[in-house]
Regions:
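Proline/glycine-enriched tight loop/beta-turn segments at coil->beta junctions
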Residues: 66-74, 103
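Alpha/beta-hydrolase active-site loop
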Residues: 118-138
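Short beta-strand element of the alpha/beta-hydrolase
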Residues: 72-82
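Short amphipathic alpha-helix adjacent to the substrate-entry channel of hydrolases
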Residues: 89-109
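Serine-hydrolase catalytic-loop signature spanning alpha/beta hydrolases and amidase-signature enzymes
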Residues: 82-90, 107, 133
């Protein structure tokens, strides 16, 4: 249905977008395929940093630290995504930035379990696990975890 108040170009764009949404994107959005399988290029750790993927029984964690520096401080990063989306490269870039802003602090980013497959309190349990892991496995002092 055309809106007479909208330009011909505006109506054309709306019709094209509606066609795309109904044909190629409707199923992947409804099924969650776009959320579950995001398409991103492989992340490359920048020079001067060490990067380790830590596999737990429930979820992966990514530990980033500057080469040759140990400040005794670490940032526990809980990425955005509203507890429904996976970690993306932008959060890996944030981890590098956080490390620089903290004058060489380490950063642990967790790719916590997300809803609807893992409802509350799964993500919270993952965050607590990561906090305890930093204390028990990496021997950080609790007051040095941000």
């Amino acid at each position: 249905m055309r809106d007479k108040r909208v330009s011909v170009r505006g109506n054309l764009v709306r019709d094209m977008m509606q066609n795309v949404m109904e044909t190629s994107l409707k199923q992947p959005i409804q099924s969650g395929e776009l959320r579950k399988n995001p398409v991103e290029p492989a992340w490359i750790c920048p020079a001067g940093y060490e990067y380790e993927i830590v596999e737990t029984e429930q979820f992966p964690m990514e530990y980033l630290r500057p080469e040759g520096i140990f400040t005794g401080r670490v940032i526990l990063q809980l990425h955005g995504g509203g507890y429904i989306g996976p970690m993306k490269n932008i959060y890996r870039k944030f981890a590098v930035r956080y490390s620089k802003l903290s004058f060489g602090g380490d950063v642990l980013t967790i790719d916590y379990r997300v809803a609807p497959e893992y409802p509350y309190p799964a993500a919270l349990e993952d965050a607590v696990y990561a906090y305890k892991w930093l204390i028990q496995e990496k021997e950080y002092e609790p007051d040095h975890i941000i």
